[in-house]
Swiss-Prot record:
GO BP field: collagen fibril organization; endothelial cell migration; endothelial cell proliferation; epithelial to mesenchymal transition; heterochromatin organization; negative regulation of DNA-templated transcription; negative regulation of stem cell population maintenance; negative regulation of transcription by RNA polymerase II
Cofactors, names only: Cu cation; lysine tyrosylquinone residue
Disulfides per UniProt: C84-C148, C97-C158, C128-C138, C218-C291, C231-C301, C265-C275, C351-C414, C364-C424, C395-C405, C464-C530, C477-C543, C511-C521, C573-C625, C579-C695, C657-C673, C663-C685, C732-C746
Protein name as it appears in the record: Lysyl oxidase homolog 2
Gene Ontology molecular-function annotations: calcium ion binding; copper ion binding; oligosaccharide binding; protein-lysine 6-oxidase activity
C-alpha cells in the first residue's frame, strides 16, 4: 500500500531530528584530524591522560582475525589480562581503537568471540564517553573487580585506516621506586667533534629531560649494565669502553647540570625506565660540590653491521654477527618481523606462549639491533610455514642467542596463528628528512621527491618514473616510516606543490628491496636521464601499514602431480591461449597428442591484508574458453629446469582469475570469478587451481628422460606488493623416465639452510620408496 508523500516526508524529518543530535554528540567525542589531508604529516601525539590515571598498554589477540581486530587485552600491574563485555559499548571500542592507532572502531563483539583469554579480567562494567585518552580513564568496577569469566571476554573490530603519524608508546613508563619520577625522555648527546659529524650518534653524554631542561647523569654510580640498556634503547647491540681522559678535560671547561638521581640497571631491561632508582647524588652548587666531584655519565655504543657509520674510515670493530641461526620475516622495517629459528637445517617459527620483551631483546641483539621495543604476539607480522621449533621461551636477557634460552621443545597446542615476532630499536639515521611525498590525497601517497646536493646546495626534486616498480616503492615507504608499498606509479597526477621541485634529479633507480634508503639503490647519480620528462612522469607511491603474503602449498603439488597424454582435438582452447610448447603447432590436430605434467596448486594468503590484482576492472581480459575475466596476465610461472638451472619446459598459462576457493575457520569469502565478481585473495583464504583445468600444466612432450627441478614462482614480476617475497618460490626434485614422473622434496624457497639447499640441488636420488636412492 502506498503512503502519501507528506507522510514519507514527515517521517524522514522526524528521523533526522532524532539522529542529528546523536550524530553531533558522537562526532564531538571523536578527535579531529584535519592534518590528515595536509603534507607533510605531523607526528601524532596521543591526548595526555590525567596524572592520576593508571599507565596501561593495549593489544588485540585471539585466533582467526585480521590485524585490526581481536580480543581486547590490557597490560596492567605487570600482567596481561582481559576486559569483560558487561556494559561495553561502541564508545569504549572507539577508545580502544584510537589508543592502538586506528581512526575509529567499526564494531565490537561479546562472549569471547575471539577465544577465551588468560590471566585476570582487569575491567568490568566499563563505561566510556568516547573522548577518553586511554581506556584506563573510563569508569569501571575497579582494577580486577569482576564477577565475569573468560567466556565473556570482549573484542573489537577497528577500522583499517591508521591515524597519520601515530607512534606506539611501547615501553610502559614505570614509576621509579614509587616516587613521582618518570624517565620519559633520554638522549645521547655527542660531545666530541668526531661523533657530532657522524650518523648515527653512538657516543656522548647520557642526558635526561627534567621539565624543559636536559640534564646529565652523574657517573658516580654508573655501570656498564646501565650503558648496555641505554645503547639498546638507541638501537645498538652493546657498549664498549671509551677514552675517559678526553671527557675529563672537556667536563672541566664548563659547568654541568646534573640530574639528582642515579640509575641501577641489571642490563637486561628493554628501556631505562624499567631500571631501579639508584642512590641519590649529593648536589650542592653553593659549595661547588657537584656529582660528588664525579663526571657526566658517558656511553659508547657498538653499531650493528647494517648501521656502521658513514665515512671512509668506518669502524673496524663494528658488530659483525656470526652465521645467523635466527632471522626476521614479514616486517615492514629493518629490525622488525616474525622470528624464525634454524634447527636441523630447517627454518621454523616460535610460539608466542610466554613471549616477552626480555626474550625479544635477545633476538634483536643477536641480529645486530638494540633492545626490543615490542614483543609481537598472535602472528601480527604474518604467519610462517613449516615447523614450530620453540615454545614457552624464557630468557634471562644475558644470552647471546635465543637458542641459549630455556624453552619447551614441544609445540603441542601451538599453531602458526601464534607465531611470535619482534620490533627492535634501531639507530636514528635521519633518512626520513631526505625524502618526502608531495601532492597526495593523504600522507600515505604522493609524488616521490628527494633531497640531493647540486652545485654545493641541497635541492628537492623528482625521481624519474621510467622503470619505477613496487620494489623501489617499498624502499621509499620504509624510509618514510609508512610501512609497505601498496602501489608504484610511473605517472603521477598529484598536485605539484612546490614548483621549485618539478625538476627530475634522480633517474635509473634500481633497488633490491633491502636498502635503508632510496639513495642506497643503484641510480644514475648526477648523470640524470629521463627521456619522457615532464612533471607527470615523476615516480609516485602509495603506502600501507599492512601487506598480503602469498605462499604455495608445496605438499599439494607433490601429492597431485601426474602425466597425461591429451589428444590435440581436446586442446583447442589451450592452443588459442598459447598454453602449449611451440612444437604443438606442428602436431597433427586429429591424431596427435601432447604429454602434460599436471598438478594442483593451492595459493594461501598468510599476510595481514587482502591480495588484490594490480589492474582495475577496466583492464581485465575476457576469456571465452573459461567464460570469465582474468585480472592478472602473469600470476605464476611453472618451469621445468635441468640441474644446471636451464629452463627445458615451461607452463604457458596466459592469465589468471583470482578468487577465494576456501577460507580458514569463520573467515568470509570476498572474491569470486563468476558474474564479473571482484577478484583477489582474502587474508586467511586460498585460491585453488585444480590439476584438471585448462593450462594448469607444463607441456613436456619434447623433454627427454632425466633428473630435473620443478619450480613454481608466484607473483614473479612483483606486480603486487607483499610483505615477504622470499617465500614466493617452490622447488621440487623430479625424475622422468619417459613414461612416469616422480616429484619429491617439494619445499618453499628459504625453508632450509644454504647448506641443505645445496644438497637438495645436487642430490640425484629419491627419498621415498618409489625409486631407490643412487
Amino acid at each position: 500500500m502506498e503512503r502519501p508523500l507528506c507522510s514519507h516526508l514527515c517521517s524522514c524529518l522526524a528521523m533526522l531530528a532524532l539522529l542529528s543530535p546523536l550524530s553531533l554528540a558522537q562526532y564531538d567525542s571523536w578527535p579531529h584530524y584535519p592534518e590528515y589531508f595536509q603534507q607533510p604529516a605531523p607526528e601524532y601525539h596521543q591526548p595526555q591522560a590525567p596524572a592520576n590515571v593508571a599507565k596501561i598498554q593495549l593489544r588485540l589477540a585471539g585466533q582467526k582475525r585480521k590485524h585490526s581486530e581481536g580480543r581486547v587485552e590490557v597490560y596492567y600491574d605487570g600482567q596481561w589480562g582481559t576486559v569483560c563485555d558487561d556494559d561495553f559499548s561502541i564508545h569504549a571500542a572507539h577508545v580502544v581503537c584510537r589508543e592502538l592507532g586506528y581512526v575509529e572502531a567499526k564494531s565490537w563483539t561479546a562472549s569471547s568471540s575471539y577465544g577465551k583469554g588468560e590471566g585476570p579480567i582487569w575491567l568490568d562494567n566499563l563505561h566510556c564517553t568516547g573522548n577518553e585518552a586511554t581506556l584506563a580513564a573510563c569508569t569501571s568496577n575497579g582494577w580486577g573487580v569482576t564477577d565475569c569469566k573468560h567466556t565473556e571476554d570482549v573484542g573489537v573490530v577497528c577500522s583499517d585506516k591508521r591515524i597519520p603519524g601515530f607512534k606506539f608508546d611501547n615501553s610502559l613508563i614505570n614509576q621509579i621506586e614509587n616516587l613521582n619520577i618518570q624517565v620519559e625522555d633520554i638522549r645521547i648527546r655527542a660531545i666530541l667533534s668526531t661523533y657530532r659529524k657522524r650518523t648515527p650518534v653512538m657516543e656522548g653524554y647520557v642526558e635526561v629531560k627534567e621539565g624543559k631542561t636536559w640534564k646529565q647523569i652523574c657517573d658516580k654510580h654508573w655501570t656498564a649494565k646501565n650503558s648496555r640498556v641505554v645503547c639498546g634503547m638507541f638501537g645498538f647491540p652493546g657498549e664498549r669502553t671509551y677514552n675517559t681522559k678526553v671527557y675529563k678535560m672537556f667536563a672541566s671547561r664548563r659547568k654541568q647540570r646534573y640530574w639528582p638521581f642515579s640509575m641501577d640497571c641489571t642490563g637486561t631491561e628493554a628501556h631505562i625506565s624499567s631500571c631501579k632508582l639508584g642512590p641519590q647524588v649529593s648536589l650542592d652548587p653553593m659549595k661547588n660540590v657537584t656529582c660528588e666531584n664525579g663526571l657526566p655519565a658517558v656511553v659508547s655504543c657498538v653499531p650493528g653491521q647494517v648501521f656502521s657509520p658513514d665515512g671512509p674510515s668506518r669502524f673496524r670493530k663494528a658488530y659483525k654477527p656470526e652465521q645467523p641461526l635466527v632471522r626476521l620475516r614479514g616486517g615492514a622495517y629493518i629490525g622488525e618481523g616474525r622470528v624464525e629459528v634454524l634447527k636441523n637445517g630447517e627454518w621454523g617459527t616460535v610460539c608466542d606462549d610466554k613471549w616477552d620483551l626480555v626474550s625479544a631483546s635477545v633476538v634483536c641483539r643477536e641480529l645486530g639491533f638494540g633492545s626490543a621495543k615490542e614483543a609481537v604476539t598472535g602472528s601480527r607480522l604474518g604467519q610462517g610455514i613449516g615447523p614450530i621449533h620453540l615454545n614457552e621461551i624464557q630468557c634471562t636477557g644475558n644470552e647471546k642467542s635465543i637458542i641459549d634460552c630455556k624453552f619447551n621443545a614441544e609445540s603441542q597446542g601451538c599453531n602458526h596463528e601464534e607465531d611470535a615476532g619482534v620490533r627492535c630499536n634501531t639507530p636514528a639515521m635521519g633518512l626520513q628528512k631526505k625524502l618526502r611525498l608531495n601532492g597526495g590525497r593523504n600522507p600515505y601517497e604522493g609524488r616521490v621527491e628527494v633531497l640531493v646536493e647540486r652545485n654545493g646546495s641541497l635541492v628537492w626534486g623528482m625521481v624519474c618514473g621510467q622503470n619505477w616498480g613496487i620494489v623501489e616503492a617499498m624502499v621509499v615507504c620504509r624510509q618514510l616510516g609508512l610501512g609497505f608499498a601498496s602501489n608504484a606509479f610511473q605517472e603521477t597526477w598529484y598536485w605539484h606543490g612546490d614548483v621549485n621541485s618539478n625538476k627530475v634529479v634522480m633517474s635509473g633507480v634500481k633497488c633490491s628491496g633491502t636498502e635503508l634508503s632510496l639513495a642506497h639503490c643503484r641510480h644514475d647519480g648526477e648523470d640524470v636521464a629521463c627521456p619522457q620528462g615532464g612533471v607527470q612522469y615523476g615516480a609516485g607511491v602509495a603506502c600501507s601499514e599492512t601487506a598480503p603474503d602469498l605462499v604455495l602449498n608445496a605438499e599439494m603439488v607433490q601429492q597431485t602431480t601426474y602425466l597425461e597424454d591429451r589428444p590435440m582435438f581436446m586442446l583447442q582452447c589451450a592452443m588459442e591461449e598459447n598454453c602449449l610448447s611451440a612444437s604443438a603447432a606442428q602436431t597433427d590436430p586429429t591424431t596427435g597428442y601432447r604429454r602434460l605434467l599436471r598438478f594442483s596448486s593451492q595459493i594461501h594468503n598468510n599476510g595481514q591484508s587482502d591480495f588484490r590484482p594490480k589492474n582495475g576492472r577496466h583492464a581485465w581480459i575476457w576469456h571465452d574458453c573459461h567464460r570469465h575475466y582474468h585480472s592478472m596476465e602473469v600470476f605464476t610461472h611453472y618451469d621445468l629446469l635441468n640441474l644446471n638451472g636451464t629452463k627445458v619446459a615451461e607452463g604457458h598459462k596466459a592469465s589468471f582469475c583470482l578468487e577465494d576457493t576456501e577460507c580458514e575457520g569463520d573467515i568470509q569469502k570476498n572474491y569470486e570469478c563468476a558474474n564479473f565478481g571482484d577478484q583477489g585473495i582474502t587474508m586467511g583464504c586460498w585460491d585453488m587451481y585444480r590439476h584438471d583445468i585448462d593450462c594448469q600444466w607444463v607441456d613436456i612432450t619434447d623433454v627427454p628422460p632425466g633428473d630435473y627441478l620443478f619450480q613454481v614462482v608466484i607473483n614473479p614480476n612483483f606486480e603486487v606488493a607483499e610483505s615477504d617475497y622470499s617465500n614466493n618460490i617452490m622447488k621440487c626434485r623430479s625424475r622422468y623416465d619417459g613414461h612416469r614422473i616422480w616429484m619429491y622434496n617439494c619445499h618453499i624457497g628459504g625453508s632450509f639452510s644454504e647448506e641443505t639447499e645445496k644438497k637438495f640441488e645436487h642430490f640425484s636420488g629419491l627419498l621415498n620408496n618409489q625409486l631407490s636412492p643412487q
